[in-house]
Swiss-Prot record:
It is found in: Cell surface; Secreted, Extracellular space, Extracellular matrix, Basement membrane. One of its GO terms (cellular component) is extracellular region. Transmembrane segments: none annotated. PANTHER family: MIDKINE, PLEIOTROPHIN FAMILY MEMBER. Disulfide bonds join 36-60, 44-69, 51-73, 83-115, 93-125. Pfam families: PTN_MK_C, PTN_MK_N. One of its GO terms (molecular function) is growth factor activity. It comes from Gallus gallus (Chicken). Induction: By retinoic acid. GO terms for biological process: cell differentiation; positive regulation of cell division. This is Midkine.
C-alpha cells in the first residue's frame, strides 16, 4: 500500500512542477511582448508564387515585427486574403450574358486591412447546368 501512495505523491509533484513551468513560460512571453497597442500590419506576402506560407510586417511607433501568415491557394485575389466575406447563394443563370452572380458582405477585416463592404462575383454558367435544363425540357413533352 505504501509504494502506491508514494507513486501517487510523486505523480502529483511532477504535475505541479509542470504547471508551474508552463506558468513561468507564459509570464516570460508577456514580459517580452510590446506595450504598444496601435499596430499597423501590412498584407501577407507569400514566400513563393502567390499563395502558401509567407510573412506580414507590422509597425507600431519605433518597433517593427514580422509574423508568419498563410494565404490559401483558393483565395480571391481581387478581395485580398485578409478580407472575409459572407456570400449569398448563386443567382440564376442569365440567358443574355451566360453568367451567374452573387454578392458578399464583409464579415471580418483582418490586420487592419482595407476592405470593400460589399463585393460582387460572377462566373460562367456551366455546360452541365445547360444540359440538365435541356433534359428536363425533353421529359415534359412526352
Amino acid at each position: 500500500m505504501q509504494p502506491r501512495g508514494l507513486l501517487l505523491l510523486l505523480a502529483l509533484l511532477l504535475l505541479a512542477a509542470a504547471a508551474e513551468a508552463a506558468k513561468a513560460k507564459k509570464e516570460k512571453m508577456k514580459k517580452e511582448g510590446s506595450e504598444c497597442q496601435d499596430w499597423h500590419w501590412g498584407p501577407c506576402i507569400p514566400n513563393s508564387k502567390d499563395c502558401g506560407l509567407g510573412y506580414r510586417e507590422g509597425s507600431c511607433g519605433d518597433e517593427s515585427r514580422k509574423l508568419k501568415c498563410k494565404i490559401p491557394c483558393n483565395w480571391k485575389k481581387k478581395f485580398g486574403a485578409d478580407c472575409k466575406y459572407k456570400f449569398e447563394s448563386w443567382g440564376g443563370c442569365s440567358a443574355k450574358t451566360g453568367v451567374k452572380t452573387r454578392s458578399g458582405i464583409l464579415k471580418k477585416a483582418l490586420y487592419n486591412a482595407e476592405c470593400e463592404e460589399v463585393v460582387y462575383v460572377s462566373k460562367p454558367c456551366t455546360a452541365k447546368m445547360k444540359a440538365k435544363a435541356k433534359a428536363k425540357k425533353g421529359k415534359g413533352k412526352d
